[in-house]
Swiss-Prot record:
Boundaries of every HTH LytTR-type domain copy: 137-241
Organism: Enterococcus faecalis (strain ATCC 700802 / V583)
Name of the protein in question: Sensory transduction protein LytT
Keywords assigned: Cytoplasm, DNA-binding, Phosphoprotein, Transcription, Transcription regulation, Two-component regulatory system
Alphabetized Gene3D superfamilies for the sequence: 2.20.25.10, 2.40.50.40, 3.40.50.2300
Gene that encodes the chain: lytT
One GO cellular component term: cytoplasm
Domain of life: Bacteria
Length: 242
């Protein structure tokens, strides 16, 4: 994996270069302090993974990110910056991750492993399935924002404005309302079963009768989700059970 680090601070570049180079997947690390120098490096090295700061010596990191959108094969883009307020904007220009300074070894490892996995699973364009993909959902973590594919979500629940998004064996937490995230989820994939629950219909394993004419849904990950009386009719209709 060829890595390019674009940052106008020499010490930050040096630190990140050291952390990145500790991983066996990384075969080379190049550095640049400006958009112009970064473009030269990209023409020469064609990096697989790009760590990009926001404030550079000539233009903004977003200017470079915008240029990447026009490339036939853009590098795996990770913003690495001291500013947390630009995270949502970063994902709008196709960033895969957003990490904050000072850098932590564990987070760099997560980025490298995630990038390696995605590159290893890449399918040539002429053999890839052409089915439509849902837009990833940004989820605000403690110190970073995660992008989660809707089809990977099993369940979303809310309690006192605290959202829990269940993805495989992991649970992401964020502040918000169920309605706010429901609007971002594809209606063909998700069903609201209760004022506090939305589930992915493709993750349903079993539906059981419950008390007072309600239902209980068992998901493939073992989660149990109630279907309240006011949602039973709509739930059955969406599954073709009525």
């Amino acid at each position: 994996m060829h890595v390019l680090i674009v940052d106008d601070e020499p010490l930050a570049r040096e630190e990140l270069s050291y952390l990145v180079s500790q991983h066996p997947q990384v075969t080379s690390v190049a550095e640049a302090d400006s958009v112009a120098e970064a473009m030269e490096e990209m023409m020469d090295q064609k990096p697989d993974l790009l760590f990009l700061d926001i404030h550079l010596t000539d233009e903004s990191g977003f200017d470079l990110a915008e240029k990447l959108t026009h490339l036939k094969k853009a590098p795996y883009l990770v913003f690495a910056t001291a500013y947390d307020q630009y995270a949502l904007k970063a994902f709008q220009v196709n960033a895969k991750d957003y990490i904050l300074k000072p850098f932590e070894e564990e987070k760099i490892t997560q980025v490298i492993e995630k990038a390696s996995k995605e590159m290893g699973q890449a399918v040539p364009e002429n053999t890839a399935e052409k089915g439509p993909k849902s837009e990833a959902i940004p989820i605000q973590g403690e110190d970073r924002i995660y992008l989660v594919a809707p089809e990977d979500i099993y369940l979303v629940s809310v309690e006192e404005r605290q959202l829990s998004i269940f993805v495989d064996q992991q649970v992401y937490k964020m502040t918000g309302t169920l309605n706010s995230i429901e609007q971002k989820l594809p209606a063909t994939l998700f069903i609201k079963t209760h004022r506090s629950f939305i589930l992915n219909r493709t993750k349903i394993q079993e539906i059981q009768p419950w008390f007072n004419n309600t239902l209980q849904v068992i998901l493939t990950n073992g989660s149990k989700v109630p279907v309240s009386r006011s949602y039973v009719k709509e739930f059955k209709e969406k599954l073709g059970l009525s």
